[in-house]
Amino acid sequence: MILTVTLNPSIDISYCLENFNMDTVNRVTDVSKTPGGKGLNVTRVLSQLGDNVVATGLLGGDFGDFIRSGLDALEIRHQFLSIGGETRHCIAVLHEGQQTEILEKGPHITKDEADAFLNHLKLIFDAATIITVSGSLPKGLPSDYYARLISLANHFNKKVVLDCSGEALRSVLKSSAKPTVIKPNLEELTQLIGKPISYSLDELKSTLQQDLFRGIDWVIVSLGARGAFAKHGNHYYQVTIPKIEVINPVGSGDATVAGIASALEHQLDDTNLLKRANVLGMLNAQETLTGHINLTYYQELISQIQVKEV
């Protein structure tokens, strides 16, 4: 079973407008409200793949109940911890081919709630083989909280796929608690290193050889339309993907995480892990809805992905 962790979920609201005018009334022609957050995008894709997945994290208030009901409607199992605060909204205004986002920070998590969630994980870890940890930390949680969570997962011999950035990721990399996989994009990798990084294979290879990444089994760097560059142990791979028509790239990284977790769950080899990860990211980009894939095109696309050891 794959357990997905979303500590700062949201209700994602999309407003579709023909025109977006400031300082006046805008009439919405179409609106959608769905359970959101990076980890729940991962969850939906895994569910669509047919993998055995359970979602966990922190939910509070009526908005938290809305997310539970939304997952129930999709027949996705979940075991969230209830908190005192109200789960947040994230609003996307789609207008004239553009997207304007308004993101709430979310509830403040108390120390008691933070400790309770780690205890909650101890009770549900046994059934899981793979843990995905995605997204930002909500207010109240220290920057080393993911490191504490990963340390707990390691104690239970669980593989962890981590998708976060900034201080939360830096704190993990500096700790003794190492995840199995991290998936930075080139911008996030640049922020970690503190200097610009090009698409040069030699530069990417030397970057991933730095001590900062020691102890991490897989480092998979997303390069957007250029594919990916990956390090697995002492092996390095260049992933080349075909050109596709991109409808909505939001959530493609989450779909990629789902592919990594699924490949680990099914014990795929390096080449097929990288292919599954990348094809799911591409399939998500071809859909209007975030965290959705159309498996009709799976074989057609995956057959065009090239993985080369370098």
From Swiss-Prot:
<dbReference type="InterPro" id="IPR029056">
    <property type="entry name" value="Ribokinase-like"/>
</dbReference>
<protein>
    <recommendedName>
        <fullName>Tagatose-6-phosphate kinase</fullName>
        <ecNumber>2.7.1.144</ecNumber>
    </recommendedName>
</protein>
<dbReference type="Pfam" id="PF00294">
    <property type="entry name" value="PfkB"/>
</dbReference>
<keyword id="KW-0418">Kinase</keyword>
<keyword id="KW-0547">Nucleotide-binding</keyword>
<dbReference type="GO" id="GO:0005829">
    <property type="term" value="C:cytosol"/>
</dbReference>
<keyword id="KW-0067">ATP-binding</keyword>
<keyword id="KW-0808">Transferase</keyword>
<dbReference type="GO" id="GO:0005524">
    <property type="term" value="F:ATP binding"/>
</dbReference>
<dbReference type="InterPro" id="IPR017583">
    <property type="entry name" value="Tagatose/fructose_Pkinase"/>
</dbReference>
<dbReference type="InterPro" id="IPR011611">
    <property type="entry name" value="PfkB_dom"/>
</dbReference>
<keyword id="KW-0423">Lactose metabolism</keyword>
<dbReference type="GO" id="GO:0009024">
    <property type="term" value="F:tagatose-6-phosphate kinase activity"/>
</dbReference>
<dbReference type="GO" id="GO:0019512">
    <property type="term" value="P:lactose catabolic process via tagatose-6-phosphate"/>
</dbReference>
<dbReference type="InterPro" id="IPR005926">
    <property type="entry name" value="LacC"/>
</dbReference>
<dbReference type="GO" id="GO:2001059">
    <property type="term" value="P:D-tagatose 6-phosphate catabolic process"/>
</dbReference>
<dbReference type="GO" id="GO:0008443">
    <property type="term" value="F:phosphofructokinase activity"/>
</dbReference>
<comment type="similarity">
    <text>Belongs to the carbohydrate kinase PfkB family. LacC subfamily.</text>
</comment>
<comment type="pathway">
    <text>Carbohydrate metabolism; D-tagatose 6-phosphate degradation; D-glyceraldehyde 3-phosphate and glycerone phosphate from D-tagatose 6-phosphate: step 1/2.</text>
</comment>
<dbReference type="InterPro" id="IPR002173">
    <property type="entry name" value="Carboh/pur_kinase_PfkB_CS"/>
</dbReference>
